[in-house]
Amino acid sequence: MKEMKQLLLKKIKEKSIISGVVGLGYVGLPLAVEKAKAGFKTVGFDVQQEKVELVNEGHNYIGDVVDKDLKMLVDNGMLSATNDFSFIGDVDFVAICVPTPLDKHQQPDITYVKSSAEEIAKYLKKGTMVVLESTTYPGTTEELLKPILEAGSGLVCGEDFYLGFSPERVDPGNAVYKTKNTPKVVGGIGEDAVEVIAAMYEAVLDSDVFRASSPAVAEMEKILENTYRNINIGLANEMAILCDKMGIDYWEVVDAASTKPYGFQPFYPGPGLGGHCIPLDPYYLSWKAREFGFHTSMIESSMMINDRMPEYCVDRASKLLNARSRKALNGSKVLVVGVAYKADIDDYRESPAIDVIDILDNNGAEVDYYDPYISEYKNKGDVKKGLRDIDADTVKKYDLVMITAAHKVVDYGMIAKNASLVFDTKNAMKDYSGNDNIEVL
């Protein structure tokens, strides 16, 4: 066992280790690129043939990856992609970066993790380090992954291969913190595994590596990060609803509270939560808590508040149309600006704006959308195309404009000047908040 550790550490030091990344999405591709840039030959795997071909041609499809970096790494042979799991037999260190969504019953769906583990097990060789990076409930690494890998490979964890967990911390569109400079948390089954995982990430990243005492600690800390955000955004949404009823500007309240130099962190309301982590992760924790007879009442309350925000925003929009324009939502023309789940990115996973559009449509509104980063999106098997651009004449055609993502490149001054009515759920038009035609969440 010590010999296995020493060999892996030696390979890491010499940059002779071959790294594998399973899943080439928003998490996996940036990680694969950073490993290759650090001098480790890296092979990425994805079930989508299109992604494999794009990577092997040096074409980037992820906003947080620099195009020229990907092309250079592919051209010099440091990075390649495949859809054949047999590559696992050639790698020494493999990171699993696959989706962990919810099923139709809002229960954890770890199908991708399970199927990846089953395929990896078929080709797993002695001396390999396996790390799960997908966000999941505490216990997944030891209770699910370990038995699958051992049963499928005939190898013993800790003796023949190492296993650990290191949560991804990707924040799409963040201009400051990328994969390279975001601190990493690592947890392994056994101290030797932790040492190997930490050594690898210390060789790849320009950031601190925190060594957790177990995979469960590392799994729980990621859930804590996102549940913390979920709960505080839920509080902000509830406060915004109350402030509206009381005739108080919540955004001014937050600005005032933010002057306190300690003990307060601002959170802002919106049409709901989006992205792959924050709306979903608390469900993973709540589900796991029931195994221990524990009810996560605060967490579930915040989830309920956040999940209802798209409907609340449409209700506010309907009342606004009725009060200001004496029009019903049914038959009104509505332009939704921004379908990305947050500002300045092209990612619409779990975006509340899509729910807003669905609810508007179901209530009889004639809905179009504009997003400078997303020309079309898929939802429930259908494709909805957005407007290619908007100008004064375009905006004047609509009874209501709803702002659901605060993209900086949008001309809000033009909207403020020409829109009949605006409902701004993101305070994107704060510079024009004095206009009579604008109402803010």
Language-model features, listed with the residues they occupy:
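Structural/interface elements that position substrates and couple domains in central-metabolism enzymes
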Residues: 1-441
